[in-house]
Each structure stands twice: as structure tokens, then as C-alpha cells.
Amino acid sequence: MRVDLFDFDLPDERIALRPAEPRDSARLLVVNPHAESRPHAESVPHAESRPHAESAFSDHRVGDLPSFLRAGDALVFNDTKVIPAQLEGIRHRDGAGGQQVSATLHMRVGPSRWKAFAKPGKRIKEGDRIAFGHSGESCLLGSLDATVEEKGEAGEVTLAFDLSGPALDEAIAAVGHIPLPPYIAAKRPEDERDRADYQTIYAREEGAVAAPTAGLHFTPALFEALDRAGIERHFVTLHVGAGTFLPVKADDTADHKMHLESGTVSAETAARLNAVKARGGRIVCVGTTSLRLIESAAEESGEIRGWSGATGIFITPGYRFKAVDMLMTNFHLPRSTLFMLVSAFSGFETMHAAYKHAISTGYRFYSYGDASLLFRKDK
């Protein structure tokens, strides 16, 4: 499909620079192509007073989520934890003077090796030495130095650090910064609040460069409400990479290549999710990262298997979903792979109309913005 078919106009003022407080007070746009199956507005505490009759859309709050789920449904969360993966340093070559460079780590490929996006990418060569954390910041744990081992396309490099394992992790934590999405970083600098705001309350597996942002809306109070409603919670891990921020430069979706991200679905979690399906429950993914991982781990039959590896799954309209029934996700960029994914999930025309509604009624977009709850069009 042509990439420009996924374009839309988004006013700058719709981009959220801070999250809602409390987190579960964010707005929730429910998008149900099968409108007759959604709850009546009067049964949902925070339904906004707008006639929905036969509409596929209804306006709510994230705290209303239990009203749209049934006992026995299962929420699938991505428990990856964002690391301070934005590094600043000085490049050295053949004993010559240094040049300022930045690198955003995006996928670990060994105890001492990371793939990263480096700037200025054109001036970096294989064999270059980069000393990170030496310009105005001291690394208390020793030099965070690396060699450029490989150079790929679009500024991607493989860095071989002198440190390894936990020592490398501690050094990165000491000098790195939270890599805010470009659309936020362009409007304000990262600050201490972001270290908490840009992390889910259940994050535990370190390795992500970007937060699984749909999960940012969850609070202990919302978890308690979901427990009372008999909704199961399960966790998988997909370490979100910096590739999620990269624009689609191709003119056709067939020519776009996704960057790989590493993830794991344990055999135990797979078995529990299969049991949910067998009992008639629904698999509800919290975030596109959870969905992409579950779909990567699913057989054509819909059975989910234990899985570990790197996925580059690219979901566009025409994709046949194998396991996921519902999706909770934030509002995405025009022409992005994630808007393509939601268009595949709930329908191309439906999602264009949903985003038009969201923009006209003041929903907040992107990582710190509001959320949507999507029903699958072919269910």
C-alpha cells in the first residue's frame, strides 16, 4: 500500500508533553466496528455526553477499562524497563582530535555489544573509538569507552564497549539519559520527572529504549479494579528499540524494513494464554509491542507458543491476526508503522475516522497522550 494513504493532519497542540495525573484519568477512545457489542454509555461511569447510537466510537476514561472487558479475559503487558540509552561522547580516530557524537542504544547483541543509532552517522567509521560520558560528566565506574565494530545503514552502528555485563549496565545508567521521543525532545529537554513518568509501574526487565506507552496509564487502583472484575494479567517482554521513532521513508509499505527487537514469551505464559482462549476468554494486548510479540509467537492456528528471539514483524492492512482479540494503544504518528498496525486491526477507514474524531474532540497524542481501546474488525 502507498505510505501516503496513512497520512493525516495533526495540530502541534495535540501532542502531549506530560502525562495525565493520575495516570488512569487519561481519556480512552473505544473503537468498536461492531457497535452493537459495546457497553451502553450509561453503564460506564465516565462516558461523555455525546450521542453514540450506531457510532463505532465512544469517549471514556482509562479508569473505565474494566467496563469493556469480561471476567476471564486476559490483559497482556510488556514488562520491559526503559534504560537511559541516550549517550553523549567524543569520537577519536588515529590520535586526532575528538568530535562530539551521540548514540542511542537500541538492541543488545552481547554482554559488551549494542546496536545503536549514531549522529553524525556519516562521519563515523568502523574502528573509531568513542569515549562516552567524558564531556562534562564523569563516569564513576570507569571509562565508558567503545569501538565502532560495524557500520550499517541510516546511522546504525554496532558498538563494542570495553566494559561488559553488569559493569556496563551500571556505567550506562550513570551517564545515560532517557531517550525521549523526538516529538517531545524537540519541545523541551528531558528532566528528572521523565525518569518516573516514562516508565510503567510494572517494568522489571531492563533493555528498552522506548516505553511501551499504553502501559503508562495503569495504576495500582486500576489493577485492583481489574482484579475485582476477574480480568487476568500476564506479562511478556519485548525490548522496544529506537527504530520505533524512525520515519517510514519508503513510498510503499512493501519497501519498508522494520528494525529487529528482542523479546520473550515464556512457555508458562503461552500455556496460560492458550487456556484463556480455550475457555472463551479474549486476549487483550496492552500496547502494540505486546501485540507484535504475541503475533510473532502464534501459530497459524492461533495457538501461542513459548518464544524467544528477535522480531521484525510488520503489520499492515491485509494481515490476518492469529491470536489477539483486542488492543489498547495510544495515538500514533501520521505515516507511522503503528498507525498502519491499528488500521490493520480495526479497519483502514474506521481508524482514519477514529483519528479524525480524536483530533476534533481534543484527545492528546503520542507517548504521554491519551489511549484507545480497539476491537478487532474481523471478530
Curated annotation (Swiss-Prot):
GO molecular function: S-adenosylmethionine:tRNA ribosyltransferase-isomerase activity
Enzyme Commission identifier(s): 2.4.99.17
Region of interest called Disordered, as start-end residue ranges on this chain: 35-58
Pfam families: Queuosine_synth
Subcellular location: Cytoplasm
Catalytic activities: 7-aminomethyl-7-carbaguanosine(34) in tRNA + S-adenosyl-L-methionine = epoxyqueuosine(34) in tRNA + adenine + L-methionine + 2 H(+)
Listed pathway(s): tRNA modification; tRNA-queuosine biosynthesis
InterPro entries: QueA, QueA_dom1, QueA_dom2, QueA_sf
Keywords, ordered alphabetically: Cytoplasm, Queuosine biosynthesis, S-adenosyl-L-methionine, Transferase
GO terms (BP aspect): queuosine biosynthetic process; tRNA wobble guanine modification
Main location, first listed in the record: cytoplasm
Listed GO CC annotations: cytoplasm
Uppermost EC category: transferase
Family recorded in the similarity comment: Belongs to the QueA family.
HAMAP family found in the cross-reference section: QueA
Subunit note: Monomer.
Function: Transfers and isomerizes the ribose moiety from AdoMet to the 7-aminomethyl group of 7-deazaguanine (preQ1-tRNA) to give epoxyqueuosine (oQ-tRNA).
Name of the protein: S-adenosylmethionine:tRNA ribosyltransferase-isomerase
Organism field: Rhizobium leguminosarum bv. trifolii (strain WSM2304)
Gene encoding the protein: queA
